Amino acid sequence: MIGRIAGILLEKNPPHLLVDCNGVGYEIDVPMSTFYNLPQNGERVVLLTQQIVREDANLLYGFLTPQERTTFRELLKITGIGARMALAVLSGMSVQELAQAVTMQDAARLTRLPGIGKKTAERLLLELKGKLGADLGELAGAASPSDHATDILNALLALGYSEKEGLAAIKNVPAGTGVSEGIKLALKALSKV
């Protein structure tokens, strides 16, 4: 399974990307939340991915944050929600907004998303309740510890640390810290473990 892609962004045409990794071009679909935060064509990009193998296709879905990928995976577990619908949910609202809607059992908020009717919204609320995880629940009520958390996490992943280690280390980085200083603080926290 392909869990992460790092390479040069060649093309972006919502919601599709083409990323060159050592001469191989990977087509990746991303939610709009990820799409709007991508670098320019020709720049390096790191995406966490979810590979879906079907009888007629081998598909890759990409995300800038571990929370988006985790939420995508949880959405796929729900009956009647496929990859396209899960991508539409993450394109229509942030992970924090989804976690908040689930916590508040706000079906009306979910029905505003394209392709989500009342029954589907109620199923989402029922099946996601308590499954978004502690990290996502914390995100629903609070801002991330650092404004550059995604960049810092991607750097830690590139250095070979796991997502879990990276997320734990980022909690030690104060808000407003720059990327390079944040990486240093995160590495310092990881060296103490």
From Swiss-Prot:
Highest taxon of source: Bacteria
Matches recorded under SMART domains: HhH1
Region (Domain II): 65-139
Compartments where located: Cytoplasm
NCBIfam families named in the record: ruvA
Quaternary context: Homotetramer. Forms an RuvA(8)-RuvB(12)-Holliday junction (HJ) complex. HJ DNA is sandwiched between 2 RuvA tetramers; dsDNA enters through RuvA and exits via RuvB. An RuvB hexamer assembles on each DNA strand where it exits the tetramer. Each RuvB hexamer is contacted by two RuvA subunits (via domain III) on 2 adjacent RuvB subunits; this complex drives branch migration. In the full resolvosome a probable DNA-RuvA(4)-RuvB(12)-RuvC(2) complex forms which resolves the HJ.
Homology family: Belongs to the RuvA family.
Name of the protein in question: Holliday junction branch migration complex subunit RuvA
Lineage: Bacteria, Pseudomonadati, Pseudomonadota, Betaproteobacteria, Burkholderiales
Designated gene of the protein: ruvA
